[in-house]
Amino acid sequence: MSHSACPKPATARHSQALTGEIRIPGDKSISHRSFMFGGLASGKTRITGLLEGEDVINTGRAMQAMGARIRKEGDVWIINGVGNGCLLQPEAPLDFGNAGTGARLTMGLVGTYDMKTSFIGDASLSKRPMGRVLNPLREMGVQVEAAEGDRMPLTLIGPRTANPIAYRVPMASAQVKSAVLLAGLNTPGVTTVIEPVMTRDHTEKMLQGFGADLTVETDKDGVRHIRIVGQGKLTGQTIDVPGDPSSTAFPLVAALLVEGSDVTIRNVLMNPTRTGLILTLQEMGADIEIIDPRLAGGEDVADLRVRASKLKGVVVPPERAPSMIDEYPVLAIAASFAEGETVMDGLDELRVKESDRLAAVARGLEANGVDCTEGEMSLTVRGRPGGKGLGGGTVATHLDHRIAMSFLVMGLASEKPVTVDDSTMIATSFPEFMGMMAGLGAKIAESGAE
């Protein structure tokens, strides 16, 4: 799916107070896994609150291509799964569009099957490195035919019987951890993942919920040992997907920056591996009230009331990066309006996202008058309270939905408008973004729609 074929620029202008109550679309990580585990489990899985962005739908299509039956009735997705170990060889390559999570997790899921599976994606996904997932699969006996640098398009040829491995994850990556655990589902014996730095743990929680024999132990040094016994039975479940914290970040930061704003965001996932942004903003002085914290489907959920706040710069501890890796672009926007300097470090993962996200953010900030310094793995932003003199630039989004949404948020509070060169790809993660922001009072218009 090529987004660049017909780009839709959009411009955000200085807005009056944002007010109202919103419910954020379902969490992307949990939505991908709901389709995957539901498609793999025996019996019926029912999902409400699913994020219906293109990325997640592509994961659903991949599961259908391997035998799962998926349909929608009203607001509920109903999946009849094939049963663990019973995926079918797809007749055509699996097309993941822009979905890095869907592609990498599915590589783990199918790699250990005695079959041939091909993966393709859009221009952006085809540039992203897949070796980090392919290397442990190779250790399990999977043969890989890939484009140069272990990139897509690629084909996996599974072994007759996979070898269980103990794999130490070399970087903080939930996708690598998850791919190995999913490969372990169809592997005899015990597959172990050793995780020195904890990352989002939806795969572990959800697999346990579906009945997998999976245990997690944390040693005295904080290193997690996750063990899964292969070839067990998974059983269909009922899932209500909580709101995505990474999508929540955009209206949340907008409400903090636009003077006089008071916005309530309902049903937000508050899993501790995902709340780094909220913690950081609170340290900067953000007025974020956490209302009715509760458990839903084994996950922490709460409502957030966010009021406009005067922010001050902070140093963000690098070890917090895994819990907010997708939120750094919008944190950089918040930092642009804060008093003093904000230092973000440990950002090497941002270099291999949908774009080189670190460079894209730095260029976008510079184009809009922000004083910032880009390091190899760091970004330092010196803010201008009230957004005085900020804006007036056009941002190259590089087909990256989070860059587009972050800079549209900037334009709502900066003195001059901010334009992004394309907004079509926002649909990959947050199709309702434009309408939801407009409902709160944000002035965002697609070019030509003035």
UniProtKB/Swiss-Prot annotation:
MF terms (GO), sorted A to Z: 3-phosphoshikimate 1-carboxyvinyltransferase activity
Any GO CC annotation of this UniProt entry: cytoplasm
Keyword Amino-acid biosynthesis among UniProt keywords: yes
CDD domains: EPSP_synthase
Main subcellular localisation: cytoplasm
Active site annotation, chain numbering: D326 (proton acceptor)
Catalytic reactions of this protein: 3-phosphoshikimate + phosphoenolpyruvate = 5-O-(1-carboxyvinyl)-3-phosphoshikimate + phosphate
Gene3D superfamilies for this protein: Enolpyruvate transferase domain (3.65.10.10)
Keywords per UniProt: Amino-acid biosynthesis, Aromatic amino acid biosynthesis, Cytoplasm, Transferase
Gene Ontology annotations of biological process type: amino acid biosynthetic process; aromatic amino acid family biosynthetic process; chorismate biosynthetic process
Pathway assigned to this chain's UniProt record: Metabolic intermediate biosynthesis; chorismate biosynthesis; chorismate from D-erythrose 4-phosphate and phosphoenolpyruvate: step 6/7
Location(s) in or outside the cell: Cytoplasm
Binding site for 3-phosphoshikimate: K28, S29, R33, S173, Q175, D326, K353
Enzyme Commission number: 2.5.1.19
Residues reported to bind phosphoenolpyruvate: K28, G100, R128, Q175, R357, R402
Pfam families: EPSP_synthase
Keyword Transferase appears in the UniProt entry: yes
InterPro entries hit by this protein: Enolpyruvate_Tfrase_dom, Enolpyruvate_Tfrase_sf, EPSP_synthase, EPSP_synthase_CS, RNA3'P_cycl/enolpyr_Trfase_a/b
Enzyme class (EC, first level): transferase
Assembly with partners or alone: Monomer.
Function of the molecule: Catalyzes the transfer of the enolpyruvyl moiety of phosphoenolpyruvate (PEP) to the 5-hydroxyl of shikimate-3-phosphate (S3P) to produce enolpyruvyl shikimate-3-phosphate and inorganic phosphate.
Family classification: Belongs to the EPSP synthase family.
Official protein name in the record: 3-phosphoshikimate 1-carboxyvinyltransferase
